[in-house]
Every structure is written in C-alpha cells, then in structure tokens.
A protein has these predicted regions:
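Positively charged n-region of N-terminal signal peptides that target proteins for export
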Residues: 1-8
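C-terminal motif of bacterial Sec signal peptides marking the signal peptidase cleavage site
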Residues: 15-19
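Bilobed "Venus flytrap"/periplasmic-binding protein-like clamshell domains
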Residues: 24-51, 55-56, 113-179, 293, ...
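An extracytoplasmic/periplasmic, membrane-proximal ligand-sensing/linker region
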Residues: 40, 168, 172, 179, ...
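Pocket-flanking alpha-helical
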Residues: 42-46, 59-98, 118-126, 171-176, ...
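Pocket-lining segment of extracytoplasmic ligand-binding domains
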Residues: 83-85, 92-95, 160-251, 257
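Short helix-loop capping/hinge motifs at secondary-structure junctions, enriched
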Residues: 122-129, 257-260, 313
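Ligand-binding clefts/hinges and TM-proximal coupling segments of bilobed small-molecule sensing domains
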Residues: 135-151, 224-295
Length: 317
C-alpha cells in the first residue's frame, strides 16, 4: 500500500511538471531554409542558450502563419513572424478568418525590416503595373506573402485575376524563376535574402521598385507597411538603391511561457546586440527602438519588464 501511494505521488509530480512545461528547452518556428528567418533564428537560439541557459531547437517551417498555429497548438514556444500576419491572427481576419482571433502568443520584440522584394529576370517588367498578364509567384495561398502581394497589386490597380498567379514558396519561386517557368516573384524577407542572392549571381535577376503612388496608397490603407531602401550592392549587379515597402520581422512567444523565462530571453537578446550584429547582417537593425515600435499585438509581461528597466513602456497582457 505504501509503495502504491509513493508511486501515485511520483506520478502526480511528473504530471505537474509536464503541465508547467520545460522552460529550459524551447522550440522556435522560423521559415524555409533559404529565407532569413531560419538563419537568424539559429543566431538568436545560440545567444539565448549562451546567455539565458535555455536550449532553443530551431526548426524550418512554412513561415508566419504556420508558426502562429504551431504556438497555438503547443508545438512551438518561440517563433519569428511578419508583423502584418501577427495582426491578422490577433484580429482573426484575412489568413486567420477560418481560425478566428488567436490569443495564445505575445510579442518579445521587433527584429528587422522584412522587405517586400519583387524579383524578375524579364526586362519588360519595370514596375508593379507591368505584371499584368505575367506569371507571378505570390506565395502560398493565404500566407503572409500572398496578402502582401495582393495588397501591392491592388495599390497598382491590379487584382489577382490580372496576373497568372503561382502559389509557391521562396525556394520554389527561385527555382521557377531560374527555369523561366514564371516571370516574377514576390519574396518577403530581410535583405539580403539567400534565395535572391543566388538568383542575382546565377541568373542576372533584379529587383523591381515598389514606390511612389503605390507605396503611398499601401501605407494609407495598411499602416503596418513602411517604406524601405535596399542599399546599392546588396545583390550582385544592383548598382542603385531600390525603394520598396516593408513589414517587420517579430519574435513572439507562447502565453504559456513564464514571465521569468521570457524576461531572461529578452535580456539575452537585447543585452547582446553587438554579438548578434557580428553573427548576422540583419543584426544591424536590432535595437530597443526597433523592438518596441509598430507592434500589432501585446507584449509578454516578461518582455515588458525588461523594456521597463530601459525606461520604455509597452502594452502587455
């Protein structure tokens, strides 16, 4: 009888610990291996492990929506997402219309600008308007890239029906461009993006500007867009700056994560900006200001605690 009681108590302790989750090991959803999320996520994971003692298993995923759903399902505890997709999830609209509003994630901080990059090798495509009648990859249906492409087409007076849409991932878009199966592709990622770098070197691809009246209308209709310049020589053969629009790559965390763990993660990242800058080009955009501005969902209380120590107040929940 005594032995049974001891076993039952042990079982209760195990179940209790499992329900709290293992805060020393977390899984981070990122993106495709040819995108910026995956490589940058690896850098963040290493920094978190070295400074906070939390092991982060970085996994390749289908991107922002998959990452948010993964957190909601309990498969991931951390994830990188586009700020606009995060807004859709919080409101239960666009790509999250079917799922409804989700409240299972919180913001840790903004990371860097995710440029909307319109890539082509077709010399007749000089503007968004020139996409009419062309085969264009606009990302997976319902993805963040898809809605970015739809927004930009609309700002140029076009609809999905005015092009020959192809619903492809970063890697598939790059392969299709290289094989001349499509005429252009929308790729949303931090520049330089590995997939685009390869295209510019191997196939003389180039970027089409998204600027002027198109950018103005886009920002008027959707305030999470801002203008952004991709500096000259970011890609092979790019002689001049290219103006486009951007959303923001954001690190989010599950609401199940403790305040202490999230505080330590936030501190591990933003107390070590120089180390992250040295490890990845997009680290140059990492700052307290960038981390706390333009967010479209509430911060985790652990992150808010860290930023409060830096005299920055953010909305938390």
């Amino acid at each position: 009888m005594k032995r049974i009681v001891i076993l039952m108590l042990a079982l209760v302790m195990v179940i209790g610990l499992a329900s709290c989750g293992n805060t020393n090991v977390m899984t981070m959803g990122t993106g495709g291996t040819q995108g910026t999320y995956y490589g940058y996520g690896g850098i963040l994971g290493n920094q978190i492990k070295n400074s906070a003692g939390i092991t982060v298993n970085v996994v390749s995923t289908d991107g922002s929506k998959a990452n948010i759903l993964g957190i909601d399902a309990g498969n991931y505890q951390l994830a990188t997402v586009q700020s606009d997709v995060m807004a859709y999830a919080a409101a239960g609209e666009r790509s999250f219309e079917k799922e409804g509003a989700l409240d299972s994630f919180r913001v840790i901080g903004g990371l860097y600008a995710e440029a909307v990059q319109l890539v082509t090798m077709d010399p007749s495509i000089k503007s968004v308007a020139d996409l009419a009648g062309k085969k264009v990859s606009i990302g997976a249906a319902g993805s963040g890239v898809y809605f970015n492409a739809i927004d930009i087409l609309a700002a140029a007076g076009l609809t999905e029906n005015d092009i020959v849409p192809q619903y492809q991932s970063f890697g598939d878009s790059a392969d299709a461009l290289k094989d001349k199966k499509i005429d252009a592709a929308f790729i949303v990622a931090g520049a330089p993006t590995p997939a685009i770098q390869e295209l510019c070197i191997a196939a003389s691809a180039y970027l089409v500007p998204i600027d002027g009246a198109i950018a103005d209308k886009l920002m008027q209709d959707s305030p999470y867009y801002t203008t952004y310049k991709i500096p000259a020589n970011t890609y092979n053969g790019q002689a001049e700056d290219v103006t486009t629009v951007t959303v923001k790559a954001t690190l989010i965390v599950s609401t199940s994560a403790s305040e202490e763990a999230v505080y330590n993660i936030t501190k591990a990242i933003f107390d070590n900006v120089d180390s992250i800058k040295a490890a990845h080009a997009k680290g140059a955009e990492l700052s307290l200001e960038n981390a706390t501005s333009g967010m479209t969902a509430p911060f985790h209380k652990g992150a808010a605690k860290y930023f409060a120590e830096k005299n920055i107040t953010v909305e938390s929940k």
